Regions:
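Catalytic and substrate-binding regions of extracellular carbohydrate-active enzymes
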Residues: 1-167
Length: 168
């Protein structure tokens, strides 16, 4: 990804009246995963300084019950399968109390590509967070037109050889 648009593992594109942030990073090491939310390929869209599409939020300053609830849902602004997050979190309260947000199964970013030309910005990324359980790779493509306030997106599930069953 073009480092001019990447902050950490977030890709940020800002136009006059529109901003978009896309999470294109691998989960952190367990020692740094205390507040991780598992929203890989999730995005936030701001138009005219108003949030249009947003994530469920960062739980660092919430109560432990709200933080756990935030992590337990797959309701981030990204694709999910069968109400299952792309990462699996430790559900043992004692372990979470001592170590924070522990991940049992992590995803891996497979591809990440940012391109730009005179007409648009384009971001494509994919991860394997659903491969082990469902046999699919999740790919997200987002295109933002430069001259108009338009955004186009596509989510794809690509079947792998490890696919135990097909989705309807």
């Amino acid at each position: 990804v073009n480092k001019n648009y990447e902050i950490g593992d977030l890709v940020k594109i800002k136009k006059k009246r529109m901003e978009i942030f896309i999470d294109c990073g691998n989960p952190p090491a367990n020692t740094f995963a205390k507040h991780y939310q598992a929203g890989c390929l999730a995005f936030e869209l701001i138009s005219n300084k108003q949030k249009i599409i947003c994530n469920t939020g960062y739980a660092k300053y919430l109560s432990s019950k709200l933080a756990l609830l935030s992590r337990s849902t797959a309701a981030h602004s990204t694709l999910y399968i069968n109400n299952t997050s792309s990462c699996i979190f430790q559900k043992n309260k004692s372990i979470n109390k001592v170590y924070g947000n522990s991940l049992i199964q992590k995803l891996r970013i497979i591809s990440k590509n940012f391109s730009e030309d005179k007409n648009y910005y384009s971001i494509e990324a994919s991860h394997n967070g659903y491969e082990k359980k469902f046999g699919y790779i999740h790919k997200r493509s987002i295109k933002i037109l430069k001259q108009e306030d338009k955004i186009f997106g596509l989510d794809e599930l690509k079947k792998t050889k490890k696919c135990p069953f097909l989705l309807n």
